[in-house]
């Protein structure tokens, strides 16, 4: 997310770190680089102009205390203005209805149907509530089939009637949700190839009938600045409460995220970060700005760890590390928990200063992880608890059982030995373990 833009901005800001004073002369080239980076990321020209003017004005007008590095102050100004550009503060969902209703709208191809399933999954996991999906796209049978399939995958009920009146379907779905004690109703409306009066009239009728707590517009981030016109077109007819930006995980410039709030006054509430059904994140401007500038996102990292890692198991492993008893059984357990967190390269990007440490470009081959797991599982419990007993004949057996080579078994044992030594140093130095 925002990787290309982040690289450009970080490179530009790196140049001011050593300056003893901020002057118009020594920041002019850097401001030009920031301007170009934003424009090339497809940020709206008007937004770029206002952003750079504000940053420059604040930087030159700040009284710098002797204890503060001017370069650090400039970076703080840039970050604060980025946060403001992205929406200032995160805007929570209004879920006060009984049941609360959320209406998702958008053009065809924006990822609306997949997004509504992701959102239902998000609400169920994060808030432990019972969601109901509603199929109101009666013009595309494939859309109803897709929603039913997604609902089946997630074990979330999909309400559909097969009628041709989406307003009636939405109304009946609310009554059904009340009768069956559903907490949230998520309405998947019909998409169009472009905004037209027929689409808008239908959406307005659903809105007037259901009176949803949230009306979220799903937008493909790869649309670039055309997305602004789409948001404006919908917002002229419907009181949008938020935007969901999809496909921010792909090779997209992401500039629309920096333009939406400033130009339309509609907040970004969610972003799609992967194609998986758990690939939807609540949008937080402060965290997003930190990630753009390479400051990491520790809060997200902790949240992911809290969701995925078994606390008791982690405490048990930590205790064994501190006692110097960490073995391959513990290693296997730890690896399985780390796998739950998602791709390791994505986690590394959340660590502050990861780019400077050169760890953001690390590529972890899933096949290699599978080989490691197979090797450890091919050992006997005794061998996992006492790796020192694994000699030549045992290595040959383990390699054959795991479909790998003796060289790979040797490599794993060497890496495990290095890891144990490192852990011993950490615990001797009273360093806290990251879980």
Where are these regions (language model features)?
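Short, glycine/polar-rich helix-capping loops at beta-to-alpha or helix-loop-helix junctions
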Residues: 141-147, 227-230
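Primarily NTPase-proximal linker/entry elements flanking Walker-type ATP/GTP-binding cores
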Residues: 9-136, 143-163, 169-179, 183-189
């Amino acid at each position: 997310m925002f990787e290309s833009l982040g690289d450009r901005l970080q490179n530009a800001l790196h140049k001011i770190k050593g300056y003893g004073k901020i002057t118009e002369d020594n920041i002019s080239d850097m401001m030009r680089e920031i301007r170009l980076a934003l424009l090339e990321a497809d940020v709206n020209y008007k937004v770029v102009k206002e952003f750079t003017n504000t940053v420059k004005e604040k930087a030159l007008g700040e009284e710098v205390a002797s204890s503060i590095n001017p370069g650090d102050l400039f970076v703080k100004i840039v970050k604060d203005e980025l946060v403001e550009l992205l929406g200032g503060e995160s805007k929570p969902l209004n879920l006060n209805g009984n049941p609360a209703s959320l209406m998702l709208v958008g053009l065809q191809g924006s990822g609306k149907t997949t997004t509504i399933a992701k959102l239902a999954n998000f609400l169920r996991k994060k808030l432990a509530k019972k969601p109901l999906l509603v199929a109101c796209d009666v013009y595309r049978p494939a859309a109803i089939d897709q929603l039913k399939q997604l609902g089946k995958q997630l074990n979330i009920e999909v309400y559909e009637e097969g009628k041709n009146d989406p307003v009636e379907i939405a109304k009946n779905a609310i009554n059904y949700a009340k009768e069956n004690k559903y907490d949230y109703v998520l309405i998947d409306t019909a998409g169009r190839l472009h905004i037209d009066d027929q689409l808008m009239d239908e959406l307005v009728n659903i809105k007037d009938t259901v009176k949803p707590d949230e009306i979220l517009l799903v937008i493909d981030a790869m649309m670039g600045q055309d997305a602004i016109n789409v948001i404006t077109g919908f917002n002229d007819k419907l009181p949008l409460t938020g935007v969901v930006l999809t496909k921010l995980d792909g090779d997209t410039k992401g500039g629309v995220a920096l333009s939406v709030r400033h130009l339309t006054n509609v907040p970004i509430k969610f972003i799609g970060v992967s194609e998986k059904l758990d690939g939807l994140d609540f949008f937080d401007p402060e965290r997003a700005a930190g990630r753009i500038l390479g400051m990491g996102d520790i809060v997200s990292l902790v949240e992911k760890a809290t969701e995925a890692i078994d606390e008791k198991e982690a405490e048990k492993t930590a205790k064994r590390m501190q006692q110097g008893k960490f073995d391959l059984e513990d290693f296997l357990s730890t690896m399985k928990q780390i796998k739950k967190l998602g791709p390791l390269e994505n986690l590394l990007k959340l660590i502050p200063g990861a780019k400077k440490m050169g760890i953001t470009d690390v590529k972890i081959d899933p096949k290699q992880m599978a080989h490691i797991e197979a090797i450890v599982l091919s050992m006997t419990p005794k061998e996992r608890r006492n790796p020192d007993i694994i000699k030549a004949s045992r290595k040959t057996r383990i390699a054959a059982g795991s479909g790998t080579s003796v060289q790979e078994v040797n490599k794993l044992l060497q890496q495990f030995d290095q890891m144990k030594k490192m852990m011993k140093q950490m615990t001797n130095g009273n360093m806290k373990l990251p879980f």
